[in-house]
Structures are given as structure tokens and as C-alpha cells.
Amino acid sequence: TKVVLVTTAQNKTAVNKDFLNNLIAYKEYITKTLGKQTEIVIIPSRYRNPTNNIEDDKNKASDWWEDDVEDFLFYGKVNFGNTLISCDSHISPTAKNPTEGYEILAEKGHVVLGHSKNHFRTLPRFRGDTLKTICTTGYITTKNYSRSKAGETGALLHSYGFVVVELKDKDTCYIPRNVKVKSDGSFIDITNSVDKNGVHKINSSL
């Protein structure tokens, strides 16, 4: 595998199907057209919304995700080059600063965390040391928050998105990059525009 596309899905929450379809199409494009074997990693996020109609006594004790994303879910730490994809860091989607406190995971280089916001920042280092970054993915699932102050804030800051992690050589990756996704599932990654009609090259001369 040369490229990993990382996003996050919340439990008991509908998936943005247009986003998922476009992400799969982009994965196939990178693999077949660009010749770089690509995989999709979806981080499972857990959140209990007591004001959701499906939160009855039977469902409170169980976690489930939409069938469409089950095959892409990862539940542990994924080491990819010098990037750590932390699929078991259970960060509340209403957290204001989701990367705070996770700097310790950046031992080798970069860290990717699952969260509903699109965050990216570089980490302190000594001169000559390897660049280290930490970022969050954004969600592939729709808004599903409690009717509370924290829930209302979380809904306002909810972002669709994913992170592209690409190997530079055997042991290192290029800096992971955030890709923001529109509500209709379309997105732009560098010079590639992806929507329901497929993947298109952007004319950089315009």
C-alpha cells in the first residue's frame, strides 16, 4: 500500500453516502490511474446521544456502525511509514481541542486522529529534528449530537473530511494533508476534483 485515505464514522449514525461513493471512486482512481495501491481506513468514533430516538434501553449498551462502512473500520493503532493512525483514541466529537494531549503519540513523525473537526498543526521540535504534525480527519457520518450546549457547538463545527497519507519512501511519509468535503460529497485534493460524475483534473492554467 502506498496511499491511505483516513476518515471517521460515528456509531449509530447515518453515513453521507455521496461522500463514501466519491471516496471509493478516488481510491480506485489513485490505484488504477496513478498506479499507487490505495486503502481506505475508517476510524470508529463512539458517542452517546441520549436525545436520539434510537437510544432506547436495548441500544444503549451496544455499538454499531452502518453496514456501508463496516469493511473499512480499523480498531487499533496503524503504523504507516512514520505516520501513526490512532484508531483507538476515543475522542469525544464535541471536544474543542481534539489534538490536545496526544502530542506524545508523535514519537516517529505524524499522528492522525479521528474527530468531527478538520484540525492540523505542527509540533515543537529541535533544529534538525524530523518534522512532526498532528491532525484530525473530519467525519463521513452526518450530524448526530445531543440537545445540549456541547452538542449544539459540536453540530456547528461538524465537518466532512478525510486525510491523505502517502508514502515518500519505505520508512517515511509526505506530510499528511486534510481534504475538506462538501455536504454533497464532492471535494478537491490538490489538482483532482471528485464528484458524482467521477474524478477530473483541474486545469491549473486557468
Which residues fall in each region the model found?
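Extended recognition/assembly regions associated with phosphoester-bond processing machinery
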Residues: 1-206
